[in-house]
Regions:
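Anionic-ligand binding patches
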Residues: 1-135
Length: 135
């Protein structure tokens, strides 16, 4: 068996980490700071086999947010409740409306699981998913 672990962090261009906010006020503050800026999402991936790290890596995704108004930010946070999301938004939900541009080789990195890297790692470990396996 292989244990798969993944997590994500978001950074501004100036290197400030936008942690999972935990509160609406912090989410509003982060989105206000990130408005009209490029953000980089880093998604880590670790595979454990027989109690040892068998594979690890980090993939990135660059996201440019639109220029957001204060009411738009408040409304978004109240509706989508992104309190446990790096960067304070859910790109797979209503947060997609906040985005102007995305640059990545794997969109799944933005969602927190670098799926293409995971599939490559499983192939390298001779444990690939079959087409009958759900992803």
């Amino acid at each position: 068996a292989i244990i798969i672990g993944a997590d994500q962090v978001c950074c501004t261009q100036s290197g400030i980490v936008l942690h999972k906010p935990g509160s609406a006020d912090r989410a509003i503050g982060q989105l206000t700071q990130a408005s009209d800026q490029w953000l980089t999402f880093y998604s880590s991936l670790v595979l454990i086999r027989n109690g040892a790290v068998a594979w690890s890596g980090v993939e990135s995704c660059a996201v440019k947010l639109r220029r957001l108004t204060n009411p738009e930010i408040r409304d978004y946070v109240m509706v989508d409740n992104p309190l446990w999301s790096a960067g304070s938004f859910h790109a797979e939900g209503a947060g997609l409306r906040l985005i102007e541009k995305i640059e990545t080789t794997d969109i799944n990195v933005l969602y927190g699981l670098p799926a293409l890297a995971l599939l490559q790692a499983l192939r390298e470990l001779n444990d690939p998913l079959t087409y009958a396996s759900p992803i």
